[in-house]
Amino acid sequence: MIPGIKCLRTNILPSHHSGNHQFTSTASNKLTFQIPSFPNSYINTKRSFIRFVLKTSANGVLVPQANPFRRLLLKSSRGQVLEDIDNSDKLCRLFQNMKTKQTLEAEAVSTKDIRAVDVGKNFSKMTNVSGQLTKHTLQSGILGDWQEYLVPVSSMVASSGYAFQLELFLNEDAKVVGSTNTNPATYSLEEVSFDVELVEVSDAIMADINSELANGAQIPLPYKSWRSHQIALSGAGTEHKIDISESAMNLTNMYSVIMPQSWSQKQSVTNIKYLAKEFDPYSFYGGRKALSASGAFTDATDYVNKYVWRYGCTYYPQSPIELVPDSTLALETSLATLDLKNNERPFMATLEDNATESHPRFESRDFVLAHSFRKSGDKGIVLGLNSANSGAPISLQLHFNSNPNASLPKSVQTFIEQENTLYIKPNGESSTVAN
């Protein structure tokens, strides 16, 4: 223990609501947390999380990895938008797939992501009208697990009564629960809380920090942020070009997944259908296999057989990646460029089983195309792509074996990851621009 420093835990309730308030997708469908400027304190984001009691209707069954939030919005005390992540539910599934199978197994009881355990045996547990306590890890670069530094909320102005305002928008019922009969199923959140760990320093330490700020110093807080781009695949052709316009000074990673353009709630869900790709709103398409509602693996015909990224006159990689005879090269390329090619293989690289056979999850439902523009692992240095330099779009050229819209209309969901810095300045002001 460092002299003059102590840790304590507190919980922040949604603004203007009591602890037993019920949030649903149609009424009270936004959670707002106003993070106070705690005196002499820093937030330890690694030890902080959102918790709530997740309830279903009597005929509702949670999808194997329920994502109750579709959008995350984080503002400073002066209203500046620091993070705005639309389709954060899809981003959450994407990063869950990049965890190891062992991690997902260990977290299943808290997160209700049961995909790494026996899904069929847990089917009955995913309907609970009395509720299940669920932990949600924020997909936030500032207040989530991605933040590697303590967040100095005590040094931020709170003239409005808070240092940050966090807004979470609830997802539609169809993407959180399926129906075990032919009637619509619903879900709700109760007992919602943002459990936070604070690191509190002494008055003497805080006085030294305030003195440095008063003399013109500033506190840099690096953080990641993500931007969502969704583009529909149009026409009946097998070649599609996706242009993404994003002005980022330090663009590090890109992730693209292929998904249905729309989703309707699945009905008459059983423990067998529960496993099917077509019953999971967060299945990613582009691979060569699918687990059907009957429990059998089927061959897909509309798989991706070639792709390449392009920015300006430069291709990434230098020549298109041809996926022959399967999608293994896309998997290994994504793992290598994201520095995931080690002994702790992610969940999307494991096998999915049915009663008689196994196939790679990457082929059956977790297909993703990823690329990292980071030139080195050094932190604090601009090593990504400056896409604001020329204004040219980033293009993803896709070649399919057959028309990807033949079975159902699809879209390409792309997330742009960039690195920013929040500068905390004298008098508690903050900005993403230094000095």
State the predicted function of each range.
Residues 1-435:
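Short, low-complexity Pro/Thr/Gly
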